[in-house]
């Protein structure tokens, strides 16, 4: 799989998200998550994104990566108000991951970001985290995010970007390209909606020449065809999905006419 730049890291174009999919505690479920992680290694996926707010997901990642931590870059998020509460939550993330170093620590949905940024900068200076990022679900947060980008206070942004949600194309993606800010894409499949909730079967015929076999691959390939995107992080609870998702990051870039087709076909069937 092609490696891309996410700040100072060389990451796989397709990563692994853990929202809901890794919020598990039962032994049988943890065994399945270990298989997912092992499949990631086979598929050359080297980046895992989690969050303190994802229930048991951080701890499940820590268990599933035991003994193979060096195969992955780990990212998580702080989501709470208050300096001391934030510090406690971050400390818990280190414990959940069972690690002394986190490659990327993000401020989840920009919650109390002005309070948490100095904490993350201190941790970065102490060598406990590698990079600082922010995430946001809504366009109203983009002006503040772009200010942080311009002032050099963050290394990465994580935003939704897919065939329907394209607001980032207007200003945020061009600025990220100009400044070299890493771009992580959440919700490339809109939590599976663009695959599971279509009114009919999309026509894959025009995409077969690229090697695309499923609509999920088409949607992921649509995202990573934008060279300003560093990585997209679909979540899954099914080990067999890893190879399917990873293929989208191993294909030749989708040409613009096929990107238009994927977008139009998705919108037609929603």
Region spans (language model):
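Structural motif corresponding to the early beta-alpha repeats
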Residues: 52-53, 67, 71-85, 109
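Conserved, mostly hydrophobic/aromatic
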Residues: 6, 16, 48, 61, ...
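A general structural detector for well-ordered alpha-helical segments in enzyme core domains, enriched
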Residues: 2, 32-36, 60-64, 89-93, ...
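Active-site mouth loops of central-metabolism enzymes
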Residues: 19-31, 75-84, 135, 204-210
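Glycine/proline-rich, positively charged
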Residues: 24-25, 38, 80-167, 171, ...
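N-terminal binding-site loop/beta-alpha segment at the start of enzyme catalytic domains
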Residues: 1-72
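Short, electropositive alpha-helical surface patch
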Residues: 62-75, 243-251
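Structured C-terminal cap/extension of enzyme domains
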Residues: 4, 31, 38-46, 151, ...
């Amino acid at each position: 799989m092609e490696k891309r730049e996410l700040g100072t890291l060389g990451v796989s174009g397709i990563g692994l998200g853990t929202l809901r999919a890794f919020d598990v505690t039962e032994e049988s479920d943890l065994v399945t998550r270990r298989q997912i992680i092992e499949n990631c290694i086979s598929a050359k996926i080297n980046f895992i994104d989690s969050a303190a707010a994802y229930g048991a997901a951080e701890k499940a990642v820590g268990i599933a990566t035991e003994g193979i931590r060096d195969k992955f870059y780990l990212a998580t998020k702080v989501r709470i108000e208050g300096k001391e509460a934030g510090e406690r939550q971050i400390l818990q993330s280190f414990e959940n991951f069972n690690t002394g170093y986190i490659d990327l620590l993000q401020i989840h949905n920009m919650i109390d970001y002005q309070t948490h940024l100095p904490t993350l900068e201190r941790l970065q200076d102490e060598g406990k985290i590698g990079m600082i990022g922010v995430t946001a679900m809504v366009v109203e947060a983009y002006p503040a995010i772009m200010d942080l980008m311009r002032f050099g206070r963050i290394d990465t942004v994580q935003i939704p970007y897919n065939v329907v949600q394209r607001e980032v194309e207007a200003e945020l993606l061009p600025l990220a390209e100009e400044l070299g800010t890493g771009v992580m894409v959440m919700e490339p499949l809109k939590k599976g909606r663009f695959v599971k909730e279509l009114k009919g079967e999309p026509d894959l015929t025009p995409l077969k020449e690229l090697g695309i076999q499923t609509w999920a691959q088409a949607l992921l390939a649509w995202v990573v065809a934008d060279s300003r995107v560093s990585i997209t992080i679909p979540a899954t609870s099914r080990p067999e999905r890893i190879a399917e998702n990873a293929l989208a990051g191993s294909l030749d870039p989708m040409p613009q006419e096929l990107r238009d087709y994927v977008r139009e076909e998705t919108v037609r069937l929603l």
